[in-house]
């Protein structure tokens, strides 16, 4: 009977149990797991088989640790072995983690066209997740996306749009959920595609800052927001078939190199530090002057950050701009469609394109402010 392992956590119950499509078997006396969904066989060692069978019997984690101790495995090693197995099985979809969270530890947020419900089993997790969003909205209303997060030992588990369970360290919760939501929102928009671009508005018209991670999109976005631009997103922008641009207005993500500028522009702000999967330490700054809805791009800026030198704008023709945009585009199915190509063509035809070479974000800010105010 696959009852699951139950661990009492304050007023909630956390249940670890084999996934419904995962089965345990012996082949030539060797323990294996078969996943019907993934169509794969996973071989277990004897210790892994012991832990799996105990969880399948409904043993608590405390019981698993204790019975491993009876096999002369010290407690810290028993915990490590058990969690190594749980982590691997969760990632492989072999183990389900289920829980119930009180609705009193929750909030709703607006992200572009979406209203997101977030619940967590403690205030620290909730605070970390709240730092992701610019617009919190706790009025009654229908949510189209739900995120739940739960802390078990030192692991955080969360579930969202796809119903699957995902895990991360507590310091990585907000960046991991942001990456998860971004990927799912891109995949849910089958008709469009996305660009690695920050998006802003100046007097109702759009500015795209294009560049791969590390090009300085977020730092320059911080500068332009301080100059009075409206914020629409700092990382990814969705492009519709009509060429309309729609950013994902998560709170502005700032890596450690931008914190000095952040403290100068927002001296009273004191945010939580988070750790991304790539090891980067980041902080999130909610932007109040946020643009809601789509934009028509009037300026396309390709960022070229260098170690030193004077900031310079160089005009690009439509062909060069198109090639660069295609290099930075990605779609849900991995292909840029003909409709996507013509959407890019509409954007390029209606916008002025430039390469911005710069080393200091303040100099780049001045050039872009002049450009967007028709002074360049």
PLM features: residue spans?
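Acidic, low-complexity/disordered tracts enriched in E/D and polar residues
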Residues: 1-49, 53
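Glycine-rich, often acidic-flanked micro-motifs
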Residues: 14, 27, 198, 202-210, ...
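Charged, amphipathic alpha-helical linker segments immediately N-terminal to NTP-binding catalytic cores
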Residues: 135, 139-186, 361, 368-370, ...
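Walker A (P-loop) phosphate-binding loop of P-loop NTPases
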Residues: 213-214
């Amino acid at each position: 009977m696959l009852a699951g392992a139950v661990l009492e956590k304050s007023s909630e119950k956390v249940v670890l149990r084999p996934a419904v499509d995962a089965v345990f078997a012996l082949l030539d006396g060797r323990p294996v797991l078969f996943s019907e969904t993934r169509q794969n066989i996973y071989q277990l060692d004897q210790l892994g088989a012991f832990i799996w069978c105990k969880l399948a019997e409904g043993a608590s984690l405390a019981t698993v640790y204790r019975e491993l101790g009876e096999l002369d495995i010290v407690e810290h090693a028993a915990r490590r072995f058990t969690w190594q197995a749980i982590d691997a099985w969760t990632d492989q979809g072999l183990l389900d983690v289920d829980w119930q969270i009180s609705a009193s530890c929750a909030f709703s947020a607006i992200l572009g066209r979406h209203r997101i419900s977030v619940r967590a089993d403690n205030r620290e997790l909730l605070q970390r997740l709240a730092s992701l969003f610019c617009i919190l909205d706790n009025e009654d209303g229908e949510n189209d996306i739900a995120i739940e997060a739960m802390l078990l030992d030192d692991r955080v588990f969360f579930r969202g749009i796809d119903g699957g369970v995902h895990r991360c360290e507590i310091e990585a919760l907000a960046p991991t959920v942001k990456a998860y939501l971004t990927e799912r929102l891109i995949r849910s928009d089958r008709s469009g595609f996305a660009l690695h671009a920050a998006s802003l508005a100046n007097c109702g018209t759009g500015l795209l800052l294009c560049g791969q991670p590390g090009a300085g999109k977020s730092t320059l976005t911080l500068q332009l927001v301080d100059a009075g631009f409206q914020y629409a997103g700092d990382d990814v922008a969705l492009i519709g078939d009509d060429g309309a641009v729609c950013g994902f207005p998560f709170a502005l993500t700032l890596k450690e190199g931008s914190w000095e500028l952040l403290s100068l522009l927002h001296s009273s702000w004191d945010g939580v530090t988070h750790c991304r999967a790539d090891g980067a330490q980041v902080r999130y700054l909610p932007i109040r002057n946020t643009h809601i809805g789509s934009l028509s791009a009037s300026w396309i800026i390709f960022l070229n950050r260098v170690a030193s030198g004077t900031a310079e704008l160089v005009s690009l023709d439509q062909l060069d701009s198109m090639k660069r945009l295609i290099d930075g585009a990605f779609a849900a199915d991995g292909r840029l469609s003909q409709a996507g190509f013509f959407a890019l063509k509409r954007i390029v035809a209606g916008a002025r394109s430039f390469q911005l070479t710069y080393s200091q974000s303040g100099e780049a800010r001045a050039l872009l402010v002049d450009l967007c105010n028709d002074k360049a």
